[in-house]
């Protein structure tokens, strides 16, 4: 008698669940629930569509396992997980605080061994100038500020120090032009102000007397005597020698002054022979002797008494 073999398609689905509990003595640690379906089908339309096709039977098994873990309960496990998270967050915050980088300053760099180096770039030579190594970043920044102010002046960009204020540039040509225009405006006055003047414009310069020592005075006097020894100053009271003048001194075309009274009377007598003036002139010449002293060639008349006499006569 022949035995036929039958093809069967077998499928198993397993699900595992862990439960945290403390099992008592004699209680199982694993619970397995198995369910087998010998007439399982893939879909409800398999029987209708495949009437003429050989159908392979299908068997499905569903297995569900519950495992009891020896340890704490679920609530204690959750509390422990929350505490662990808090510890991790605290550790992370500490790491962040310790890993904060120091503040960066202009012209300052930190060396691998911890110190700070400062350097600056010279714009004129286009080279870097080494300023030194410092313990703190602030010291290096101050060194950079001083060098920047020295090189760039008011235009320097600094960290702490304040650069000096720029000095104003004075244009001399503009200032001189303004002064000239102001002076010209002040000098323009009306014609009525010609006779007026400003007392403030006149400046008085006082000369201070300098006192010399006796030795200095004696040397100055000697120098003046030596300098005046070779000079001849004319005497203002001495009359010039007219005899040396010659004919050039007297102009023949111009008549000389009438110095003498007798000559005047002679001229009047010649011009007016029949007048009384000529007679009076003759009488006056007879009464008065008008002569000259040989030594000084001057008149011997007493001029002072003559004017006194006429003065009393008028009184």
From Swiss-Prot:
BP-aspect Gene Ontology terms: cotyledon development; cytokinin-activated signaling pathway; ethylene-activated signaling pathway; leaf development
PROSITE patterns: AP2_ERF (PS51032)
DNA-binding region as annotated in the record: 104-161
Induction: By cytokinins.
Gene Ontology CC terms, in alphabetical order: cytoplasm; nucleus
Highest taxon listed in the record's lineage: Eukaryota
SUPFAM superfamilies, sorted: DNA-binding domain
Localization per Swiss-Prot or TrEMBL: Cytoplasm; Nucleus
Gene3D superfamilies cross-referenced by the UniProt entry: AP2/ERF domain
Classification via Pfam families: AP2
Presence of the UniProt keyword Transmembrane helix in the record: no
Gene Ontology terms, MF aspect: DNA-binding transcription factor activity; transcription cis-regulatory region binding
UniProt keywords, alphabetically: Activator, Cytokinin signaling pathway, Cytoplasm, DNA-binding, Ethylene signaling pathway, Nucleus, Transcription, Transcription regulation
Described function: Component of the cytokinin signaling pathway involved in cotyledons, leaves, and embryos development. Probably acts as a transcriptional activator. Binds to the GCC-box pathogenesis-related promoter element. May be involved in the regulation of gene expression by stress factors and by components of stress signal transduction pathways.
Family according to the record: Belongs to the AP2/ERF transcription factor family. ERF subfamily.
PANTHER family: ETHYLENE-RESPONSIVE TRANSCRIPTION FACTOR CRF5-RELATED, SHN SHINE , DNA BINDING / TRANSCRIPTION FACTOR
Name of the protein in its database record: Ethylene-responsive transcription factor CRF6
Lineage, broadest ranks: Eukaryota, Viridiplantae, Streptophyta, Embryophyta, Tracheophyta
